[in-house]
Each structure stands twice: as C-alpha cells, then as structure tokens.
C-alpha cells in the first residue's frame, strides 16, 4: 500500500507573500515535482520524493489577498480544514488580523499536527491562540519588543529561528526561508533537497545560519510603548 501523502497546511490570509515562500522549498522535493523535472532530463529523484497535498485555509472560500495584491483561492475554510497535518506553516498578518475561526483552527491544529512553523509575526498570530505558553520562540526581529509586551507568556529569543519540540518559529521572511530549508534538509533526503529544493531556487540556509551576527537596534520609543494597551484599543 502506498504511503499517505504528506499534508501541508499553509495559512496565508492577509500575509506577506515572502512569509510563505518556503512552501516552494517543501514542494520542490515532492513526487509530483520529481516526475516533472525528470521528464526534462534532470536526475530522477522520484524514489526519494513523497507525495504531498497542500491545504490553504481561510475565513471563507472567497479569494483572499496576499501582498502585493496577489489573489489566491483557498482550498478550505478554517472550520472545515483538517487539523491533523504533517506540517502547518503560518505566515505573518498584521496584528489586527485575528479571525476567531483562525484562532480555533490554530489551537486545534497545533494539538494534532506533527510540525508547526511560523514566519515573521506569524508566531504572534499563533500565540494569540493560547498554545505557546512557556515555549521558546522568535518573531520578526524588529517586532520582538511588541511580542514580549503582547505575549509575555512566551520566552522570546533574539534568533533568526528557534526550534522548541515540534514548534519552529522564525524571524523575518528571509529567516523563514532558511528555517524551512533547514527543516527540509533534516527531514527529507538531503541530496535531493539540496538539488531540487535549494540549488534550483538559489537558496542556501547555511549561509547566514540560525543566529544573528549583529546586535539588535530597537528605537527607545518602541521599547517604551505600551503595545498591549495599543492593541487592546488604547493609544
């Protein structure tokens, strides 16, 4: 009996398109892509390539927009999307984008999914679902003071990406690409991933590594502002 396809959920409603570019790194080592590229004369990696099914949930099945004004058709709503995913990748929307159905989906999917990844401020979106208490995590580096103010229950670290059990969180979009690439190298056949998932896209997650090489530079006004009050409706 053939193994079940890997189910990969991608939360992209109202996010930066760059936040979910790592999806391509996951998709390139798929059986479908291996068959397509072998037909072009590239090495046949199909024996190493799993079947994959990508799931794109949103509030409704209407077209959604990601930057810069790209229109995407969801495959599921948050209410009917499967929760037991192999990988859930959460991009980063504005901090005012918090659909209740999305919070329910993240809470239930976090409990049942094997791996949960966030990029940029997607970690704050996941934290709003109440599942990250006591976890080590990161977010967009420029937004770490905001994250610490809004979600003090999380141990926020100043790193390009952080791994805590099944939770993988990254800083900005570039760090997210490197994080997904690192996960793919550790999870799938590394030669296959390097050739099909990274080199073809000119990505190298080892070039900058997991840790920042320069100190953070947060404006004092950002450190002093009451972000929790602001997003609760204050000023």
Q: Which residues does each PLM region occupy?
A:
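Short, structured coil segments at secondary-structure junctions
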Residues: 50, 112, 131-133, 151-152
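Extended, subdomain-level signal for the structured scaffold at the beginning of enzyme domains
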Residues: 1-116, 124-127, 145, 157-158, ...
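Short glycine/threonine-rich catalytic loop with a Thr-x-Gly-x-Asp
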Residues: 169-174
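Short, glycine-/small-residue-rich phosphate/pyrophosphate-handling segment
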Residues: 131-149
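Structural detector of well-ordered beta-strand residues that form the stable sheet scaffold
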Residues: 116-117, 138, 157, 168
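The feature captures the short pre-catalytic strand/loop hairpin that immediately precedes
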Residues: 154-164
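Short pre-catalytic strand/loop immediately N-terminal to key active-site residues, enriched for Gly-Thr
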Residues: 110-111, 163-168
